[in-house]
Design a protein with these regions (language model features):
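Substrate-binding pocket helix/loop in short-chain dehydrogenase/reductase
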Residues: 93-94, 98-106, 197, 201
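Conserved NAD(P)H cofactor-binding loop of Rossmann-fold oxidoreductase domains
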Residues: 85-90, 241
Length: 246
């Protein structure tokens, strides 16, 4: 088995990679910067029995996405899971977003999904799955999250259209939206308010706790299984029912 995770050396991406890291599995971890974190992630994956492959490459361009898949091809002829988790966080008000930076956010958070999927088609086939990691910012307005939120909304729409072309090939694609998970990206958005936000998130769920890594990685594992064959083009939130309150 083989899995490719963009943004796979930290946070949610790394947790998903580790969920699939078993003996005999090739785990491709894409990153852009921070080699120290990448090496640490590779060691963690290999401690679980899998083989880790680090790929340093920006996926925000068609050329970059193709280079990532070019690194996969010599190792395996089949990619079972493609997980696009790379994110460019820009915690600024929308009216202050620089157009160049906004375009980068769209490219990395959204159109990279299309670039990667197209590049991966030669090594994906019946039973392969694609995942896009989204967030509630793609559906609701979150303060200082406009650039990323708009990109997430675009990517969710792309997923629905990709279903029409991937489905006949036997490839499934879905979005998973974990909410309120303590990650570096979340702390970049909320800064010194992060702990307060996490505590409030837990209080707002009917069962009184926040989302932990096992909650969403278990969902991804299920969606990658044959049992989820008829789940296509969905955005599935993992938030403990946080937003059910009137």
């Amino acid at each position: 088995m083989a899995i490719l995770v963009t943004g796979g050396t930290k946070g949610i991406g790394l947790e998903i990679a580790c969920r699939f890291a078993k003996p005999g599995t090739d785990v491709f971890l894409n990153y852009v910067t921070d080699r120290v974190a990448a090496d640490s992630a590779a060691r963690r994956v290999e401690s679980l029995g899998a083989k880790a492959h680090l790929i340093e490459q920006d996926v925000g361009t068609p050329e970059g996405a193709q280079k990532v898949l070019d690194a996969v091809a010599p190792v395996t002829q089949r990619l079972d899971q493609l997980v696009h988790c790379a994110v460019r966080v820009m915690p600024v008000p929308i009216l202050k977003v620089d157009l160049h930076e906004f375009t980068k956010a769209i490219n990395i958070n959204a159109t990279a999904l299309l670039y990667l999927t197209k590049a991966a088609l030669p090594v994906m086939g019946k039973g392969s799955t694609v995942f896009y990691l989204t967030s509630r910012g793609g559906r609701t307005a979150v303060k200082n999250y406009a650039a990323v939120g708009a990109a997430k909304a675009l990517a969710e729409s792309l997923v629905r259209y990709l279903v029409l072309e991937l489905g006949p090939r036997g490839i499934r694609i879905n979005c998973v939206a974990p909410s309120g998970v303590d990650t570096e990206a979340l702390r970049n958005v909320y800064g010194e308010r992060t702990d307060q936000v996490l505590q409030q998130n837990a209080l707002d769920t009917p069962n009184g706790r926040g989302v932990v890594h096992d909650d969403y990685t278990a969902l991804v594992e299920f969606l990658a299984s044959p049992a989820a064959e008829m789940i296509q083009g969905q955005v599935i939130f993992v938030n403990g029912g946080q937003y059910l309150h009137a």
